[in-house]
Amino acid sequence: MATENKNLSEYDKNTIPNAKDFRFGIVVSEWNDAITEGLYNGAFEALIDNEVPAQQIIRWNVPGSFELIYGAKKMLQTQNVDAVIVIGCVIQGQTKHFDFVCEGVTQGIKDLNVQTDIPVIFCVLTDNNMQQSIDRSGGIHGNKGTEAAIAAIKMAYIRQQASISHSYNQHLLVSGVLQIEDTIKKIENE
């Protein structure tokens, strides 16, 4: 397990961009709620710790992890958010259902990231047993929800910076076109 040597809740606050003006959506699966509530608490507390006001954090619940895709899609379409975190927990059982749900959710969230301009952060535990999930939702390995919140802040910042850069480049392009037009007019008037 990749988290054995890492505490998911640890981060250097000095490396986190200012998040006080960002708005975040969190879509939480009700399935395995003892785990998903722990993940949500970790995410919420990390956002608050990084100066995101509570009223700028929107929470929606969905029945299970597979429904996270639709919930995130609708949040992206209807809420003015800078990033969305999807929180779920799928634990290996004795059937292939685990594989189908994990693959479907992973692909669905990946598709949202490709199709939209707002980052969707994947915080879905896919563990072999309940103890592994407990350990990663506030247990001995920290809280994956905290890690997801920090990723959401960083990705919202990247989105913001890309938008600023794009706007600046558009400004330069328009300015350049206007300068060319002015030069052409001067030449024509000579």
Provide a role label for each language-model segment.
Residues T3-K6, D33, I48-P53, K73-N80, ...:
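Generic secondary-structure signature for well-ordered alpha-helical cores
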Residues E30-W31, C89-V90, L125-N129:
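Short, ordered loop/turn segments at secondary-structure junctions
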Residues E67-I109, N113:
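Glycine-rich phosphate-binding loop
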